[in-house]
Regions:
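Acidic, polar loop-rich interaction surfaces within structured domains
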Residues: 1-100
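Charge-rich, low-complexity amphipathic helices
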Residues: 25, 29-33, 168, 186, ...
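Hydrophobic/aromatic-rich, well-ordered segments within soluble, folded domains that form packed cores
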Residues: 62-73, 178-190
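Conserved functional hotspot residues or short segments at active or partner-binding sites
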Residues: 79-187, 193-195
Length: 196
């Protein structure tokens, strides 16, 4: 099974790059989002000014591969302030009225080009609600929670192996290559080891 995974499904993704120097930038609407935290990627953070710098290297995406960024978000009713950020001295900090939760920007270069292209997408509460019940979302949440448990993250909160299993089993559906079944087995074994 492992050789089929490596040579059958993953080889072409490593041999054939479809995008290089891929960068993702998120801007949350402060009227809708009180606080947020990126889960994972601590070692891959870019400075804000590096997003538009075509000379700054970033990740590559191979054929058939995807990238997932997960944020923990505390929604706001728009009237409160977390009080954690000082006001700006040299910039206007007024908030634009909008129903968007965030703006997603993706910058990438085609493999044979040296200039980047920009994709900008607004995300609404409705968009988020639609994605909450997808199998991909459930799988991503279970993997992120599992990772926080394995490294005993200070942010794990009430995360548990049982919760990871619940979400992973909901995500299973058609598991053509057995990856989700393998995840479930790993979580079950980790749960047993954690009791020792």
């Amino acid at each position: 099974m492992e050789s089929n995974k490596i040579f059958g499904q993953e080889l072409w993704g490593t041999l054939y790059t479809i995008a290089k120097d891929v960068k993702i930038q998120i801007e949350f609407n402060p009227n809708k989002v009180k606080e947020y935290r990126l889960i994972g990627y601590e070692n891959r953070m870019l400075n804000n000014e590096d997003f538009n710098d075509d000379k700054k290297d970033a990740g590559e995406i191979g054929s058939g591969h995807t990238v997932t960024a997960i944020y923990e978000v505390v929604l706001s009713d728009g009237s409160e302030s977390s009080g954690k950020v000082d006001p700006l001295n040299y910039q206007i900090s007024s908030v634009v009225k909008s129903n968007d939760i965030m703006t997603l920007k993706i910058r990438y270069k085609k493999p044979n080009q040296d200039f980047s292209r920009l994709i900008t997408e607004k995300v609404t509460e409705g968009d988020l609600k639609k994605s909450e019940n997808t199998k991909n979302f459930m799988l991503a949440v279970s993997v992120a929670e599992f990772g926080m448990l394995l490294r005993d993250s200070e942010y794990k909160g009430s995360a548990s192996f049982d919760h990871v299993l619940l979400w992973a089993k909901r995500a299973k559906g058609e598991d053509t290559y057995g990856y989700i079944a393998e995840l479930i087995t790993l979580v079950e074994k980790s749960k047993l080891l954690a009791k020792l």
